[in-house]
Amino acid sequence: MLSRERVIEVIQHRKPDRMPIYGWVRANLEKQIAEAFGSVEAFEDRYEFDLAHIFGGPPQYRQEDLSALSARGGGTIEPAALLEISLQDPNEPSGYDNIRSQMEYHKNQRGRFVYVQTPGIFECLNGPFGIQNHLMYLALYEKELHEVYRRQAEWNRTFAMNCLDLGIDMIHVSDDWGAQFGLMFHPDVWRRLIYPHHKITCDAVRQRGGFLSVHSDGNVTQVLDGIVELGYQVVHPFQESAGMDLQDFKQHYMKSLVVMGGLDVQTTIGFGKLDRLKREIERIVGMFPDGGFIFCTTHFVQDHCTMEELKFAFDLVYELVREQGKK
């Protein structure tokens, strides 16, 4: 079974020949991996990664416009001010050059399932607003935020459609809502402000037959039902170290969702505790013998992780998923 086929089997709730594997390793460890393995690409080939996380696309706002607004507001941009400037054109062709080249390599040459980083609604606007101000604006400027979010949602939809046109397999919406023990804001706020604007992109992607995933760090248990309603098929990372429960997922959500995650960068990998690392990898792989899970890091592996530990982890994962697939 090819990597892309394997991932699709899992997302469609069928049992694959083995659990797909992936890892977010490039961002903090590119130099170290290149020294140890030759390149990140060689590392990905060595462990036969089944997916590729692709980045790129046109900018959403001109930095000059944001800087001017910030200067005018004394270092602060409020929602009404942001509405004074336009988003950039999501159809600008050169913005997709990197997506095309990465897709050619990973999908066409390596046979991997490719997913593209796509803006959500809350996280992407923490850039212009600042996260502390943004959280305050949820209470102060709901009317204005509806319009800011509507514009963002329409931009996101166009970007997602363009990526599907290029041959991207899955639209991966990144939108951090979770804190260590729950949401950063009340679930009712999520339902009023976040949900309807995610729905714009989600509906369009599902109508096209594209696959759909969402990333949120932290604990998003309170809105899992809403994530299902939106049509998301994959959730990353389902963070156990923030209090989320994979047993609860298996009992209540496994018929609707697939988890991509398992290797926790906050508590497990990068701390030199190989016995704990081994136990956790064995536990996670053992929980999902019949599908429903894509093994991945919960976020970017941090730069305090040694190459010896990284190799230990992925040697073990590589071996375990193949042993499991033979049963």
Locate each region found by the language model:
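Catalytic cores of TIM-barrel enzymes
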Residues: 1-327
